[in-house]
């Protein structure tokens, strides 16, 4: 999730001849397009990286804006950040080739069973019911094993069964010694090196191993739509093209699939993996929904060919649906995604969606209940579970979010929810605080987490 441009920057850029259409981007750091919206629409600042054409005073349907990435927080000023051991030197070969920095074998596994979809619920270690969990994107980037163990201790003690964390960390140059990264995409040689060293995938190894020991199940996205921790743009810098072309660029897709193979094969036999996610919040602004749909169809089939043991999900925000639509931005297909269409892909095992009312410009938080039930209806019709995999409010963690939890818990088609995001005190200080963070042991933890788990 990325931050997007200020109103001051918009005025400094100046007017551009072409007007931006409804829900289009009209400002943001590094943005060079139009800043004037079509009649009836106004350019609204959402964050430092993104301003959007939203309905003006003449427009009557409910407003919805979207902070493109409210849940990504970086602990440092670099795009790949967080410390570890010195990176190994990278090796590379011909264009679009992928090499591995060290040899590696799959990590050993412990007892436990693979998570399955069973009707409209998940079966986890023999139990078929509703589950609660959380997100902690930063966990594989920690270098102190005791910190990782402590996180899993707290999750286990609280009864949170599912954890979503990043399975990607892409860079375009070898970072400073002591920085974790998983892939190096070198623009000077158009080659990619997968880092399986002590400051690479071995950090993810430890997370998977610790999850096994604690009986926690992991959801792992394999690339980021946003620039945080490299994302799709890290591929583009090395192999060319544009963000909208990422999904169809043959060189990029071959590199992406090579990374998928390396990671999925590494943990294919681990019962700690709940599911692989194609990406975090895939978007293709202005594209036909066929672009993401075709990519998701091909990629999910590829993952299943490598690993029939684990489920696959899209990792999408859940945009683009007609059920209960109020005509607002999240219900539209403007970002190139069609939730119902993607849900029907044969190798997609369950539906996922996210919810951030404040960042979407929604002032009535009860709107979130409609968002939950809209997706649940589609999941129920498809015969697949629905996972409410990201949600939150800045600073206020115990009002609307608790109502959303109750709606999810009592709605047919819903199988689990994961709040954004988990926090605790580590050996280096507090884990990242993006104002959505709910810290272990606080009063917010009691009302938003412990009380929620007790209701299940």
UniProtKB/Swiss-Prot annotation:
Single biological process term from Gene Ontology: mannan catabolic process
Residue numbers binding substrate: 166, 280, 356, 420
Cystines in this chain: none
EC code(s) of this entry: 3.2.1.78
Cellular location(s): Secreted
Gene3D superfamilies per record: Glycosidases
Catalytic activity from the UniProt record: Random hydrolysis of (1->4)-beta-D-mannosidic linkages in mannans, galactomannans and glucomannans
InterPro entries: CBD_sf, Cellulose-bd_dom_fun, Glyco_hydro_5, Glycoside_hydrolase_SF, MAN-like
Catalytic residue list: 281, 390
Region (Catalytic) residue spans: 114-456
Any matching Pfam family: CBM_1
Primary localization: secreted
Domain CBM1: 19-54
Entry keyword annotation includes Secreted: yes
Keyword line: Carbohydrate metabolism, Glycosidase, Hydrolase, Secreted, Signal
Annotated spans, Disordered: 79-110
Signal peptide span: 1-18
Region listing for Ser-rich linker, in residue ranges: 79-113
Top EC category: hydrolase
GO cellular component, one term: extracellular region
SMART domains, per the entry: fCBD
Domain notes: Has a modular structure: a carbohydrate-binding module (CBM) at the N-terminus, a linker rich in serines, and a C-terminal endo-1,4-mannanase catalytic module. The genes for catalytic modules and CBMs seem to have evolved separately and have been linked by gene fusion.
Function of the protein: Endo-1,4-mannanase, a crucial enzyme for depolymerization of seed galactomannans and wood galactoglucomannans.
Family membership noted in the UniProt record: Belongs to the glycosyl hydrolase 5 (cellulase A) family.
Protein name: Probable mannan endo-1,4-beta-mannosidase F
């Amino acid at each position: 999730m990325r931050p997007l441009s200020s109103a001051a920057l918009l005025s400094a850029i100046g007017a551009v001849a072409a007007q931006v259409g409804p829900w289009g981007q009209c400002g943001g750091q590094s943005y060079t397009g139009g800043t004037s919206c079509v009649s009836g629409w106004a350019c609204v600042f959402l964050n430092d990286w993104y301003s959007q054409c939203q309905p003006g005073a003449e427009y009557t349907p409910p407003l919805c804006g979207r902070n493109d990435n409210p849940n990504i927080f970086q602990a440092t000023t670099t795009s790949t950040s967080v410390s570890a051991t010195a990176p190994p030197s990278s090796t590379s070969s011909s264009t679009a080739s992928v090499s591995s920095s060290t040899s590696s074998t799959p990590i050993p596994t412990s007892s436990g069973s693979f998570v399955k979809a069973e009707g409209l619920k998940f079966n986890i270690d023999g139990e078929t019911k509703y589950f609660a969990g959380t997100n902690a994107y930063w966990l594989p980037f920690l270098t102190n094993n005791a910190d990782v163990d402590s996180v899993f201790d707290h999750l286990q003690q609280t009864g949170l069964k599912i954890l979503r964390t990043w399975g990607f960390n892409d860079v375009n140059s070898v970072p400073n010694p002591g920085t974790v990264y998983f892939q190096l995409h070198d623009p000077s040689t158009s080659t990619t090196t997968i880092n399986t060293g002590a400051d690479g995938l071995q950090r993810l190894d430890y997370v998977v191993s610790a999850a096994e020991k604690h009986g926690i199940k992991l959801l792992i996205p394999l690339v980021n739509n946003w620039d945080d921790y490299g994302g799709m743009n890290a591929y583009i810098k090395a192999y060319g093209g544009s963000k909208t072309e990422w999904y169809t660029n043959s060189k990029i897709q071959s590199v992406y699939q090579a990374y998928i193979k390396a990671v999925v094969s590494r943990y294919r036999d681990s019962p700690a993996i709940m599911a692989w996610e194609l990406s975090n919040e895939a978007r293709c602004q202005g594209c036909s929904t066929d672009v993401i749909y075709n990519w998701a169809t091909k990629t999910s089939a590829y993952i299943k060919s490598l690993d029939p043991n684990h489920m696959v999900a899209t990792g999408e925000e859940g945009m683009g649906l007609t059920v209960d639509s109020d005509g607002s931005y999240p219900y539209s297909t403007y970002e190139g995604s069609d939730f119902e269409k993607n849900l029907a892909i044969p190798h997609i095992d369950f539906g996922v969606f996210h919810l951030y009312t404040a960042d979407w410009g929604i002032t009535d938080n009860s709107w979130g209940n409609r968002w939950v039930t809209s997706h649940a209806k589609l999941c129920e019709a498809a015969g697949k579970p629905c996972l409410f995999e990201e949600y939150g409010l800045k600073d206020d963690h115990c009002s609307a979010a608790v109502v959303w939890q109750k709606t999810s818990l009592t709605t047919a088609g819903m199988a689990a929810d994961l709040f954004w995001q988990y926090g605790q005190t580590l050996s280096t200080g507090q884990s990242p605080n993006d104002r959505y963070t709910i810290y272990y042991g606080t009063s917010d933890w009691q009302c938003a987490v412990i009380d929620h788990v007790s209701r299940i």
